[in-house]
Amino acid sequence: MHYSRNTVTAIAVIIGSLLIPQHIIAQADAAQTAQTAEPRQKVTLTADDAVELALQTHIDIKRSQITLKQTQRESSHSWNSLLPSIKATASGSRQGALKSENKTAQNTQELSAGLSASLTIDSGLGAKIKKLKSAYQAQQASYEDTVRSTESAVRQSFYNLLYLKEKVAAAKSTLESYQSQYDQTKNKYDRGVVPELDLLTAQVNLETSKPDVDSALASYYNTLHEFLNTIGLELPFSTDVELSGSLDDAETVQRIGPEVIKGCEDKSPAVRQLQDALRTAEYAKQYAYNSAYLPSLTLGANIFPEFHSKNLETSDSSDKPYWNVSIGISLPLDSWIYGSSARDTVAAQDDTIQDYKLQIADKKKTVRTSIIEKLTNIETSQKTLKARHLNLELAEKSYKMTEEAYQRGTKDLLALQSSLDTLHSARLQLREEQYTLLKNVLELENELSLASGTYFTTTSN
């Protein structure tokens, strides 16, 4: 009797596992007992719960809030450019003569205290105020984009966890089926109905399916811990997290027609951010140009209610409080010189504007292509889902018939194993297609600046 290489290898693994020292097995059992003895808590988490937590704790949203407050403050205080610069001054001086004939007149001491104010009205002030208001409006839109993209990412991750959970369930179901097959085959072998090879094959299938369960569990829990960190949920180690939701939400996705392509570029957050940056750059250029080529007005005022002067030779003293006002107009001339820094600053702003225009044109093409691709993928997934359901129905009936035939002895173990593998594969293919559809729809909604769930007939959890 000859065995295949895979069968011999698997049998060797089984035999090796039986040779593990008993004290190691005892330690593992003790650790498992200690863990199970610890009281476990259970937390049920829905997609809406996860989104709500993420909106409160996500680092990107917090940073965007800080930037929003900053731009709001700068915009609401943009009028402060019209506030004068006010200073309080106090000074003392002493004057002496270099020649003796001027000694009496020039040997004096002066003390003064007063206030001075000055205000420069720049020709670019209006453009500066517009630039600050534009930056605030852009940040408002950016904050909304951050909130929306965070919600979309959290929901996608939630559905990914549901898919990984289905993989765990499939692996456990496979293990249970192989355990049942092994028990049945063992019973038949004891009665002399099947050969020893069938028993060894059933045992190999059972043992090799156990690591698959461990691998699926590890992938699920690692992803779950990353997800909990993302939404800012800290739980004790003894807490079990139960996800409340279903990949069947994919069945509620509406038909999305090609009409969404019309004007889709202007709805894109990426395009809008570039357009906001372009508008801000245009105001910055206007401010730089006005400051470089147009005159500015300067107003000044001084008042010295305390001004004391004393002649140190004659001891004569006098108090002479005074005030003065001034007005001036200045026109920068260096900006008219070729190669000056002022001209280069304006030219650099022009370059920035042209660069943003190129980026916007390119981004619109990219966004349009991306949305068309997603529409195609969504339509394909919806059609594929129908085929997946039919395939699963066929696999379930085929396995049931094969299992009944195996019980009667008209089908061998390999046929039953093949039928079971086909069934589990059909289930996973259905779940994978559902997750793919959900992911594409959520991404499309985000690219069109739509709230998550817009293209669902019911609110997905």
Regions found by a protein language model. Name each.
Residues A26-K87, K133, L235, D240-A284, ...:
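Bacterial Sec-pathway N-terminal export signals of envelope proteins
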Residues Y3-S4, Q27-P39, V51, L235, ...:
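Acidic, low-complexity, intrinsically disordered peripheral segments
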Residues H2, S149-K267, K374-N377, S381, ...:
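Periplasmic alpha-helical coiled-coil/stalk elements that build and connect Gram-negative outer-membrane
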Residues K62-I66, W79-N80, T120-V147, L197, ...:
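Sec/SRP-type N-terminal targeting helices
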Residues T208-L233, E393-G453:
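Short segments within alpha-helical structural elements
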